[in-house]
């Protein structure tokens, strides 16, 4: 190549470079290689997961299929159940003969299948609170106590129709005598009419025909103690007298007998012509009126 041709080639290259620089559409694209990033963390994690899954599959596929003998009863009737606590190092087996679990590399479980040890629990003893509560129950059958409110509050109204031969008797003493011999009943006599009201049942009252014929008066002279039981049978009625304290006026036995005969005759007269109030009051107050009983 001579000097003229070299110069011409040099001009041609210069023109080509100026034309490319003046053209706005002609761009020079320079591609740079991407930066190198380290992706070792994600790849190692995925590879480790895959390795674990492979190990699990290989371990489960390579587990012993032959039956293991039970360490308790040495029976071959056993089966593989699962891995203890999801650990591949301790597989769990079940003995079908003695129904016990055991783990390879662990200890034999004495608890049978289904929790049989819970069935042998003793029943709890009854609490002391329940037994004490039964002992402290209230009494549903309290003792029946009679009270004589009407006679104690106003005894004069109760005995206004009672013709007593002995004026030394007081009404409270007569109430006590009537309660002592007729079973501690409470009476309530409505005076002024023909009505008589009893608050006690008639089955608790025991009558006798002639009460004052054999029962002397009290508080008339001196006292004598007598403990005896008199049983008088008349028309299937029984009267018991126990521990009564009697007062005699003078100590003369003949005077007392005469006094009783007078009262007995007076009672017969009242029985013939007396009113029903006197009759009932004689029954309630110990037979002072001398009237009959039935």
Swiss-Prot record:
Keywords assigned by UniProt, alphabetized: DNA-binding, Metal-binding, Nucleus, Transcription, Transcription regulation, Zinc, Zinc-finger
Compositional bias annotation for Gly residues: 284-294
Organism: Arabidopsis thaliana (Mouse-ear cress)
This protein's name: Dof zinc finger protein DOF4.1
PANTHER family assigned: DOF ZINC FINGER PROTEIN DOF1.4-RELATED (PTHR31992), DOF ZINC FINGER PROTEIN DOF4.1 (PTHR31992:SF102)
Gene Ontology CC: nucleus
UniProt cross-references to InterPro entries, sorted A to Z: Dof, Znf_Dof
Region (Disordered): 109-178, 247-294
Subcellular localization(s) per the UniProt record: Nucleus
